[in-house]
Amino acid sequence: MGRGRVELKRIENKINRQVTFSKRRNGLLKKAYELSVLCDAEVALIIFSSRGKLYEFGSAGITKTLERYQHCCYNAQDSNNALSETQSWYHEMSKLKAKFEALQRTQRHLLGEDLGPLSVKELQQLEKQLECALSQARQRKTQLMMEQVEELRRKERQLGEINRQLKHKLEVEGSTSNYRAMQQASWAQGAVVENGAAYVQPPPHSAAMDSEPTLQIGYPHQFVPAEANTIQRSTAPAGAENNFMLGWVL
């Protein structure tokens, strides 16, 4: 008669539980050792009792086996992440490709190409899009033209202001030059007679550089022909010649 099936549940009796733990622990360690020897497998076994006591077995060392385990887990995780990222990029590329093809079809339709497969409703939508685009283009053109006109008006106002300033400057300079010309004319025509000597004042410095001042003694000399001189002497009143000589003497 065989053994009955043992029900798997926690053993309430503390002593029985400790005895069962010791027996099965030893059996598990033995099985792990046998597996590593018979199958040339790298086996690591870690057991903690209910009191926290550690029992372990490692055919190649617990630390080495754990490092190998972590390395395999991380590589598998990295591989899974790389695979997931690759799939995500592939789906994204597929979406972008489909969107690009749709944009190309729309562009051809807007240019009046490949209109055969379109239905009446699609053609009406295309017509509305073209009308909207044409309206926006006209509005933009009008806006640019208005901006250009405003810019030209602004430049016109600036040029007008510059013209007024130049005109005012020329008027000021013209009045100044006229005043200087009149002053120079008065200087050229004015003569100072003092002590029987007539001294003509020279023009300003700029004119004085071109001509030298002249000093005239006596009355201004005028060329008179011989006949006229004889007539003047005959018709001159008495004492006029004496006055003329006195002018030279003085």
Swiss-Prot record:
Highest taxon listed in the record's lineage: Eukaryota
Cell compartments where the protein resides: Nucleus
Domain MADS-box stretches: 1-61
Ranges of residues in domain K-box: 86-176
Alphabetized Gene3D superfamilies for the sequence: Transcription factor, MADS-box (3.40.1810.10)
UniProt-recorded Gene Ontology molecular function terms: DNA binding; DNA-binding transcription factor activity, RNA polymerase II-specific; protein dimerization activity; RNA polymerase II cis-regulatory region sequence-specific DNA binding
InterPro entries noted in UniProt: MADS-box/MEF2_TF (IPR050142), MEF2-like_N (IPR033896), TF_Kbox (IPR002487), TF_MADSbox (IPR002100), TF_MADSbox_sf (IPR036879)
Known tissue expression: Expressed in the floral meristem. Highly expressed in lodicules. Expressed in palea and pistil. Weakly expressed in carpels, empty glumes and stamens. Not detected in lemmas.
Keywords: Activator, Developmental protein, Differentiation, DNA-binding, Flowering, Nucleus, Transcription, Transcription regulation
GO cellular component: nucleus
One Pfam match: K-box
Knockout consequences: Abnormal and almost sterile florets. Mosaic organs and disturbed identities of palea and lodicule. Extra carpels or spikelets.
Any Gene Ontology biological process: floral organ development
Self-association state and partner proteins as the record states: May interact with the K-box of MADS1, MADS5, MADS7, MADS8, MADS14, MADS15, MADS16, MADS17 and MADS18. May interact with MADS13. The dimer composed of MADS6 and MADS18 forms a ternary complex with histone fold protein NF-YB1.
PANTHER family assigned: SERUM RESPONSE FACTOR HOMOLOG
Function: Probable transcription factor. Regulates floral organ identity and floral meristem determinacy. May be involved in the control of flowering time.
Name of this protein: MADS-box transcription factor 6
The species this protein was found in: Oryza sativa subsp. japonica (Rice)
